[in-house]
Amino acid sequence: MSTIGRVTQFTVRNSTLENLQHNLSKMSTLQAQMSSGSKINSASDDPAATADVLRLQGEQRVLAQYGRNADDGEAWLTTVDTALQTSLASVRKARQLTINGGDGALGATSRIALAQEIEGIRDALLAQANTTYLDRPVFAGTSAGPAFTAGTYAYNGAPAGTVERTVASGTTIRVDSPGADVYGEGDDSIFKVLDDIAATLRADGDPTDQLDAIDGHVNKMLAEVSSVGARQNQVESAQSVISANHLTSTTRLSAIMDVDLAQIILDLGSQEVAYKGALSAAAKVLQPTLLDFLR
C-alpha cells in the first residue's frame, strides 16, 4: 500500500524560494562573466580549468623572461658586431696605409703624416676594444672595467667569465666576445703592431714587414665576426620559438577563459525571462496563510 507524502505550505514556500535563488545565482554568474569577459572569476567557478589557467599563466611568465633575455642578448651581440665591423674597417685601412708607407719615394713629412694616421687608428681601435653595453664592457667577459689598458695594452678581462643569456630551458647563448682572442694582448696585440708600424715610419724604415701580423689579426676578427653572426642567428631563432609558444599559450588561455559575448547576452536574456517567470509563479504559489490574515 502506497502512501502519499504530505505537502505543506512550508515545503512549497521553501522549494519556490530555492528555485528563485538558483535562477538568481545563475543570472549573477552570467552578469559577472559578461562584465569581466572571463568564464572564470573565482577558482570555484571551474577548479579544473582554474588549474589549467594557472599553469598556462606560469608558462607565459617563463616565456616572457626568456623573451627579455633574448632581446638583451640580441642587443649585446649587435653591439659586439658593430664594434668588430668597425675594427675590421680600421685595421684594413691601417693595412693600406702600411703598404703606402713602403713606398721608398715618400718624404719625411709624408711618412710622419702616415705614422700619425696609424696612431689615430690605434686609438680608435682601443676605443672599440673597450666598447660597452649598458656600462658593461662587451670584450672583457664578466669584468666591470675596461677590457684593455692604454699604453701597455694589457687585457683586463676575465677569460673564464663569459656573459650568457638563457633563451629556453637548457639553452644558453654567449653574448659577449673574448677581447684577448680578437685584439690580442700586450706585445701580441694589434695595438702594439700599429705602434711598431708608426715607429718604423718615423725611423724611415719599411713598415710592410708588419703586413703578416696585420693579416693575422684580420683573420681573428673575421673568425669572431662569423661566431657572433652564428650566435645572432641562434638568438633570432629563439625569439621566433618564444613568440610562437607565447601565441599558442595565449590561444589556449583564451579558449579556457574568454566568453562568447553574443552567447552570454542570449543566455542572460533567457535567464532573466526564466527568473521573471519564476517570480510570477512564486507570487501565485506563496498565497497568504490563515496566520497572515490573523495578523
Each PLM stretch: what is its role?
Residues 1-144, 199-295:
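Amphipathic alpha-helical polymerization modules
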Residues 146-203:
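Cysteine-poor, low-complexity segments in flexible/peripheral regions
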